[in-house]
Amino acid sequence: EPIFAVADLSPSPQAARHLAAVLPMQPARRADRLAQPVATLYTGGEPSADDVIDAIFALADTVALLPGAGALSSPRWLIRLQGGSDGPVPGAADYTGESDELAGSTGLAALEEIEDVAIVATPAAAAHPASHAQVVQALWAHCRRMRYRVGIVDAEQGMSLNEVRTFAGQFSDSLLALYYPWVVTADPSGVRPELTVPPGGFIAGVYAGTDVRRGVHKAPANEVLIGVTGLETDINRFRQELLNPNGVNCLRFFPGRGYRVWGARTLSDDPEWRYVNVRRYFLFLERSIEKSTQWAVFE
């Protein structure tokens, strides 16, 4: 539904509801100045046909659509909505999704139609403890089914050291990697100064950046977490020594070096697949060999 509407406007200066009269740059009433989200720059006479054509071409010109020099200093309008609902919390079935050729697949089932996905994460699931473990199970099953993918798992908000160790103990697979704790970052909307969010999105960025700069053989660790301004829980060396044997990868702050990923372990109890980079490197080799030998399938 529209949030602001004005009817029966006219570009003619002789009209009772002329553009410049109804939507002036400086409304006479203070209430209008505060509530009117748009204004007109048009104050001249009745536009000619050439003026209309030029305006239409200007709207279609991508250069004309770029923000001008004063765009950053222009007022910003924040409209607060009340009521409504975000709907029910997505559960494991929603994340798993369904394959549908006509209406389009949903959830993880939609990713099964994209061949070159290598990293999968479900950070929003960590905000709902009641269904989080089931969502991780769905992510685990997806990675196993697609063979060449790894899943990034987030610890839940506010978990203690013992709680995150117990949570990690529910899973044992080299295709999953768990990260702890949650991170603090600036609110991009500007509504709040900071947000505390799951680390999975930042970790996926570290994976992708390391892949591009160094390759999948390089451990996605000792890398700066860009955009992170704090951690929900401070992790020191002694706390990390408690979590390492359980395959929990910690995020830590180092004076002069910033916030960094300080761990690259999988959740596998098999020592041969203990590290993320080793597992991903072998997945890369397996996938490359499979693709390069397709010519021999029917030989």
Indicate where each model-derived feature is located.
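A glycine- and small-residue-enriched flexible loop/hinge signal that marks low-structured segments
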Residues: 1-299
